[in-house]
Every structure is written in structure tokens, then in C-alpha cells.
């Protein structure tokens, strides 16, 4: 009986870490993508993350290279520049 209490005391004192089943994923592209070694079937690789893995974005994501919100109003007047 003393051995059991001693074993429990040692077990609780060491605090064995519990490993969860889900890993922490790095986010990229303003939290729109996930850094992975290989992208899933419905994702497209775009650039690379800090850990040299591909930044995987959903195939429907739009990428703005200008860094600001783009104007998506595509009326006929805004498609072509005005002539002087």
C-alpha cells in the first residue's frame, strides 16, 4: 500500500505532459492560409512560410498584390481609361 502511494506521489510530482492529437499550424497571408509541407487537394501553394513550407490557400481565395483593398466595381465606365 505504501508503494502505491509513493508511486502516485512520484507520478503527480513529475507532471507528465499530455500530447494532444492536433498540431499547431502556422498561419500565413494574413491568416488566410496555412503553412504545410504539401497542400491539400483543394488548396494552391503560394510563396513560402518562415519554416520553408508552402503557404496553402483555398483555391477560391483572391490574392491582392497591391497590398490594399482593390476596387471590384467592374462597370463598363471603369474598365477602360478615359480618352482626353
Curated annotation (Swiss-Prot):
Database matches in InterPro entries: Defensin_big_dom (IPR028060)
The encoding gene: DEFB119
Signal peptide: 1-21
Superkingdom per UniProt: Eukaryota
Protein name per the record: Beta-defensin 119
GO biological process annotation, one example: defense response to Gram-positive bacterium
Role, per record: Has antibacterial activity.
GO molecular function per UniProt: lipopolysaccharide binding
Pfam families linked to this entry: Defensin_big
Similarity-based family: Belongs to the beta-defensin family.
Swiss-Prot/TrEMBL keywords: Antibiotic, Antimicrobial, Defensin, Disulfide bond, Secreted, Signal
Amino acid at each position: 500500500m505504501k508503494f502505491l502511494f509513493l508511486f502516485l506521489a512520484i507520478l503527480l510530482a513529475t507532471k507528465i505532459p499530455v500530447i494532444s492529437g492536433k498540431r499547431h499550424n502556422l498561419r500565413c497571408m494574413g491568416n488566410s492560409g496555412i503553412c504545410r509541407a504539401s497542400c491539400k487537394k483543394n488548396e494552391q501553394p503560394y510563396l513560402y512560410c518562415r519554416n520553408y513550407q508552402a503557404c496553402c490557400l483555398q483555391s477560391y481565395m483572391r490574392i491582392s498584390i497591391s497590398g490594399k483593398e482593390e476596387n471590384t466595381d467592374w462597370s463598363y465606365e471603369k474598365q477602360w481609361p478615359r480618352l482626353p
